[in-house]
């Protein structure tokens, strides 16, 4: 299985995996609008890979078969100030 990976021009660290290069028929229109301009990052042979950055390769494969695409969004950013405040509150 091979897929094309595109980087979002609108959202940092957001990637769209599709089954074929430049074929976005399975991707919902609202998602395409949110994604913004697309930049091809790479073509990936999934069958030859064990891991895929922060994405779970098995979830990517299933999503490509069932939906025709996979959207990778970055993990939520940790608010270090809030985390520090919570730690201080627990110490009281």
UniProtKB/Swiss-Prot annotation:
Alphabetized InterPro entries for the sequence: YcgL-like_sf (IPR038068), YcgL_dom (IPR027354)
Disulfide partners: none
SUPFAM superfamilies: YcgL-like (SSF160191)
Lineage: Bacteria, Pseudomonadati, Pseudomonadota, Gammaproteobacteria, Alteromonadales
Annotated protein name in UniProt: YcgL domain-containing protein Sfri_1738
Ranges of residues in domain YcgL: 1-85
Matches recorded under Pfam families: YcgL (PF05166)
């Amino acid at each position: 299985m091979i897929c094309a990976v595109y980087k979002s021009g609108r959202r940092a660290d957001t990637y769209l995996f599709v089954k074929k290069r430049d074929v976005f028929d399975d991707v919902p229109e609202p998602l395409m609008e949110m994604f913004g301009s697309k930049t091809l990052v790479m073509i990936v042979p999934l069958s030859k890979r064990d891991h895929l950055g922060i994405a779970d390769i098995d979830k990517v494969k299933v999503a490509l078969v069932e939906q025709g695409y996979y959207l990778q969004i970055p993990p939520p950013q940790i608010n270090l100030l809030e985390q520090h405040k919570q730690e201080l509150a627990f110490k009281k």
